[in-house]
Regions:
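C-terminal capping/extension of enzyme domains
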Residues: 2-10, 32, 39, 75-91, ...
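Short N-terminal binding/cap micro-motifs at the start of the first secondary-structure element
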Residues: 9, 20-24
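Short histidine/acidic/glycine/proline-rich micro-motifs that form metal-
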Residues: 27, 110, 141-144
Length: 166
């Protein structure tokens, strides 16, 4: 429902699932306090700070968005493991067809559950999705207080630099 896709993507960002706010307005990362768009801008993916309602323009900058699960929830922990695993299978096919340079998963816990990789850590993964490299980033939700804006800027910047080198 909220996929933002295109050809020649540098990075396909994979969220866990839409928030209730995102589902209501029809745009990704729309919940107030979400740090996705500030992180994209700070990392140099976009030339200015985008608003959620501009998400459909992101493929013009090599950025795509999808989610493991399409079902909106108040919190990601309301999803079942089965929903995440099913979403990972769909994601594999999507990535195979789109061939983005890099897949960036937004959330370590969701990645571990969806892909059955309990020992995964942040950063570049030894496994691929759809034959493409995978990088795990912290989830930009405002509920994730472990990371500050400067952390997101640095980590998303590492992803941009890596993807541009592929």
């Amino acid at each position: 429902m909220l996929d933002v896709l295109g050809k020649d993507l540098k990075v396909l960002f994979v969220g866990i699932n839409p928030s209730l706010r995102s589902a209501a307005v029809g745009h990704n990362f729309a919940r107030p306090g979400n740090r996705f768009y500030p992180a994209l801008y700070a990392a140099g993916f976009t030339p200015r700070l985008f608003k959620p309602e501009e998400d459909r323009d992101l493929p013009n900058y090599g950025v795509g968005i999808t989610n493991f699960a399409a079902r909106p929830t108040r919190a990601a922990d309301e999803l079942s493991r089965a929903e995440l695993v099913a979403g990972a299978r769909v994601l594999d096919t999507l990535v195979t067809n789109l061939e983005p340079r890099l897949v960036a998963v937004l959330g370590l816990g969701a990645y571990k559950l969806a892909l059955g990789r309990p020992k995964a850590a942040m950063g570049l993964q030894p496994e691929t999705i759809g034959g493409r490299p995978v990088w795990i980033l912290p989830n930009p939700s405002g509920l994730n207080a472990h990371y500050k804006p400067a952390d997101f800027a640095r980590l998303y910047g590492e992803v941009r630099t890596y993807a541009e080198g592929l």
